[in-house]
Structure formats: C-alpha cells, structure tokens
C-alpha cells in the first residue's frame, strides 16, 4: 500500500484508532508494565497476561503494539483480536477462539496470541470454557485478557494469567501524547 493510500485510510479512522500508539515506545504512562513484558519476550517466556485497569489507560494499545513488534508482517496470521463485550458467550470460546488456538502455523515459528478485550463482560460459562482452552493450547498459544474490572473475572481464569494493573495516566503523560496529535 502506498504512503498516500495509507494516509487517506488513516484519515477515515476514529480519532482513538488514528492516534493509537504503534510501538511500545509510543505508549505513555505504563513504564513498569512495558519493561516487565519486554523482559518476558526477550527471555522467550511470555506468560498468559491479564491487563486490567480503568478505560483509556493503554491496555489495548500496549498488547497490540507488543504483538506488532513480535510478529511484524505475520501479525494477521498469528494474532486474533476479539472484543469480548461483543462476543461474550460460550459459543465464541468453543468455536472462534478454540479453532484459532488449536491450529498450528506451518510457516511461522513461536506461539500465536489471542487478545480478549473487555473480557470482564464475558459470561461465567464463557470464562470457564476459556480457562479450559488456555490449559489445553498453552504450548501453541498465549492469551492476553484485557479488563476494566478484574473482580468480574472468575478466580480460575485469573489464576492462569500474570496480572498487570494499568494505572490512570498522569497528567504529564497525557500532555506528552496530545502534543503528538
């Protein structure tokens, strides 16, 4: 895609997507989380992740930027992004998530990544089914569960993830980011 085509397509995006950080270096205000997650990746030991905290603190931006750094051009083959508030039932876990997790990539090495945004909106039955999928496909797939409210997730699901609390952004971080818009 040409640069002018990319520019035109970005012009039509919602503001929040148009200015979403593309790399971890562009994510502001969550330095401890980013440092720790980068260390996991560098050591080849990325666990299943839970990013939780108030809306607008960079949870989705952080995991998408990390995935883009890990997979590069293979992003679309190796990453499944779902908004669990849209697809919150057990059928999505049994079908879409399980199918993606169970399929091995022939030409790509490493694990696949499933990003579940707003997972705190999933039903308990869906969360319990997800726990079983995580256990079964852990050799092949990593999961990043994103939630505003960790207390709405089942204890079984919480216990399978390394938890990171995203803090509200300091005023200075907000001002720095706005300066780039």
Model-derived segments and their meaning:
Residues 1-179:
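P-loop/Walker A NTP-binding region and its immediately flanking N-terminal helices
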